[in-house]
Design a protein with these regions (language model features):
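Specific transmembrane alpha-helical segments of multi-pass solute transporters/efflux pumps
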Residues: 19, 23-24, 53-103, 139, ...
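Alpha-helical transmembrane segments of compact multi-pass small-molecule transporters, enriched
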Residues: 47-51, 102-116, 131, 194-198, ...
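Glycine-/small-residue-enriched transmembrane alpha-helix faces in small-molecule transporters
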Residues: 1-43, 150-177, 197, 201, ...
């Protein structure tokens, strides 16, 4: 059984990347046929809240103090409200391929914020990674600005998708201690509940104005995919992989999402992928790889302690 665990973990990580990669073209197509970005976000947070709360009935119960419940409201603001609103509305404006490439930039934002907030050191690898990632992002944005074609990209959509990654990186940096205290199901059931409470008062009138009778069934299937696979199962598969495999191995699967998204989007005609975008993608991917491979503060501290121990006992 133990021999199968790494294989299962790898399969789960691949599935989560594939689920999220398909979510961009699937969600984009849904927003072209009957619903828009605010509708999709509303369905996603409500569906996620229902699924995670139902699942929590069959998992180990965790006591959450009232003060932490309110902390989850703030966490949900960054991780879901700002993140998903920015990403989904950005996806509605730009191409699925650009949006998926932008999602891989999150580790770069997380590194910069860790330096500012958590005082993590910046190594030369991290600095080079940030420069490469920024160069790639600038190329994508400039390509969108001069294209005049939504299938190539849209500058405002690209910026919104990038701001979504900044929002999620802020969530990871500001709520690191809170996240370490609870299981994924406890974290997500409270954050999705708060996200629903915070988003729906502003979107319910828009959702109710949907001409449901004329929305094609395919749009509802696509919305269901975003909720079930792109949200619920994607998070669970990632959790299984993270519990078994090293972070450096997990980080490799970050690239499954854009590869799946770009391939499917181009095949079905939702995006056009040009040479400059390919160069930009390589820069972003390489930058993220350098950031992820760099040593953290804990790694450096352990190395220093090890050297000190060796000197004392030499």
């Amino acid at each position: 059984m133990d021999n199968k665990r790494p294989l299962i973990a790898h399969l789960c990580l691949f599935c989560s990347g594939a689920f999220w990669g398909l979510m961009a073209p699937v969600g984009k197509d849904a927003m072209l046929h009957g619903i828009d970005g605010s509708d999709l976000v509303s369905f996603r947070v409500l569906g996620g809240a229902i699924l995670f709360w139902l699942t929590s009935l069959f998992t180990k119960k965790e006591h959450v103090p009232v003060k932490d419940i309110f902390k989850f409201a703030a966490a949900g603001l960054f991780a879901l409200v700002f993140n998903q609103c920015s990403y989904t509305i950005g996806l509605n404006m730009t191409s699925p391929s650009n949006s998926s490439i932008m999602t891989t930039s999150m580790p770069i934002f997380a590194m910069v914020l860790s330096f500012l907030i958590l005082k993590e050191p910046i190594t030369w690898k991290k600095a080079l990674g940030v420069l490469m990632g920024c160069a790639g992002a600038v190329i994508i944005i400039m390509t969108s600005a001069t294209a005049g074609n939504a299938k190539v990209g849209n500058i405002w959509g690209d910026l919104l998708c990038m701001s979504a990654q900044l929002s999620f990186a802020l969530y990871l940096s500001l709520f690191k201690n809170l996240l370490s205290k609870y299981s994924l199901f406890t974290i997500n059931k409270w954050m999705f509940l708060w996200a629903t409470v915070l988003i729906w008062p502003f979107t319910i009138s828009h959702v109710m104005s949907i001409d449901f009778a004329h929305v094609p069934m395919s749009t509802w299937w696509e919305t269901g995919y975003v909720v079930l696979f792109g949200t619920y199962l994607g998070y669970i598969c990632m959790m299984i992989g993270q519990k078994t495999l090293r972070p450096t191995v997990v980080s490799v699967y970050n690239y499954v999402q854009p590869l799946v998204s770009v391939t499917v989007s181009v095949i079905v005609g939702l995006a056009v992928f040009k040479g400059m975008q390919a160069i930009a993608a390589i820069l972003v991917f390489s930058g993220v790889w350098l950031v992820v491979k760099s040593k953290s503060k804990n790694d450096i501290d352990k190395h220093d302690h090890s050297l000190a121990y060796e000197k004392r006992h030499a």
